[in-house]
C-alpha cells in the first residue's frame, strides 16, 4: 500500500492539517500502518500536485498559518480505484501474516470501504485468505517434516521451532480474521 491511500482514507473521514493527520494516524491507522510526520508532509505535497487533495490556508492569530487538506473528486476516484485493485500475490511460505503488506493493505482498504467497491474488496479478502491457507499449509508441512517431536528439542532447533510456531499462529489468526471480514462483507453486499 502506498501512504497516499492511507491519507486519502483519513481525509475522507475529516479534512485535516498535516499535523492533525499525523496525530490521527498515530491514534488509528497507525496501529497497522506507520508514517513519520515528514513522510506525511512530503506525501501531501505530492498529492496536492496530483490534484488528489486541495489545501486551504487557515490564518491563526499568534501562530503560523496552517494548511488544511481535503480530498478532491480526483482523490476520491483514486481511492475507489485503489480499493478495487487486486492485492499483489505473495508466494506460499513467503511474506507470512507476520510480515506481509497485503494484510495491512486490507486493513486500510476496509477502513475506506465505504468509498469504494465492497464487492471487489470481498474478492480480495477471499483471495488473501486462500494465500494465507497456502502459507499455513507450507508451515505445517515444515513442522511435520522437521520437528516431529517438539518435546525433544533444545538449543537452536527449539528456537527455530518456536519461530515456525509463531508463523503458524500468525497465519491461523489472519485466516480467522479474514473469515470474519468475509462474512461481514458478504452480509452487507
Swiss-Prot record:
GO molecular function: DNA binding
Induction: Likely autoregulates its own transcription.
Record-linked InterPro entries: Tscrpt_reg_PadR_C (IPR018309), Tscrpt_reg_PadR_N (IPR005149), WH-like_DNA-bd_sf (IPR036388), WH_DNA-bd_sf (IPR036390)
A Pfam family hit: Vir_act_alpha_C
Annotated GO CC locations: cytoplasm; peptidoglycan-based cell wall
Main location: cytoplasm
Transmembrane segments: none
SUPFAM superfamilies: Winged helix' DNA-binding domain
Subcellular location: Cytoplasm
Key words, A-Z: Cytoplasm, DNA-binding, Transcription, Transcription regulation
Keyword hit for tRNA-binding: no
Known function: Probable transcriptional regulator that may help mitigate the effect of oxidative stress and help mycobacteria survive inside macrophages. Binds to its own promoter region.
Family listed: Belongs to the PadR family.
Subunit annotation: Homodimer.
Record remark: domains: Contains an N-terminal domain (NTD), which harbors a winged helix-turn-helix (wHTH) motif that is used for DNA binding, and a C-terminal dimerization domain (CTD).
Protein name: Probable transcriptional regulator Rv1176c
Native species: Mycobacterium tuberculosis (strain ATCC 25618 / H37Rv)
Amino acid at each position: 500500500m502506498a501512504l497516499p491511500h492511507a491519507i486519502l482514507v483519513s481525509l475522507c473521514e475529516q479534512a485535516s492539517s498535516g499535523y492533525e493527520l499525523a496525530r490521527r494516524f498515530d491514534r488509528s491507522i497507525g496501529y497497522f500502518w506507520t508514517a513519520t510526520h515528514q513522510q506525511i508532509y512530503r506525501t501531501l505535497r505530492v498529492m496536492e500536485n496530483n490534484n488528489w487533495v486541495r489545501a486551504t490556508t487557515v490564518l491563526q492569530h499568534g501562530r503560523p498559518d496552517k494548511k488544511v487538506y481535503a480530498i478532491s473528486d480526483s482523490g476520491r476516484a483514486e481511492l475507489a480505484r485503489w480499493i478495487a485493485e487486486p492485492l499483489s500475490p505473495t508466494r506460499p511460505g513467503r511474506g507470512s501474516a507476520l510480515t506481509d503488506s497485503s494484510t495491512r493493505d486490507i486493513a486500510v482498504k476496509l477502513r475506506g470501504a465505504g468509498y469504494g467497491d465492497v464487492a471487489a474488496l470481498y474478492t480480495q479478502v477471499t483471495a488473501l485468505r486462500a494465500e494465507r491457507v497456502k502459507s499455513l499449509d507450507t508451515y505445517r508441512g515444515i513442522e511435520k517434516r522437521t520437528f516431529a517431536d517438539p518435546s525433544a528439542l533444545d538449543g537452536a532447533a527449539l528456537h527455530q521451532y518456536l519461530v515456525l510456531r509463531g508463523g503458524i499462529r500468525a497465519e491461523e489468526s489472519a485466516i480467522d480474521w479474514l473469515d470474519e471480514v468475509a462474512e461481514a462483507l458478504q452480509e452487507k453486499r
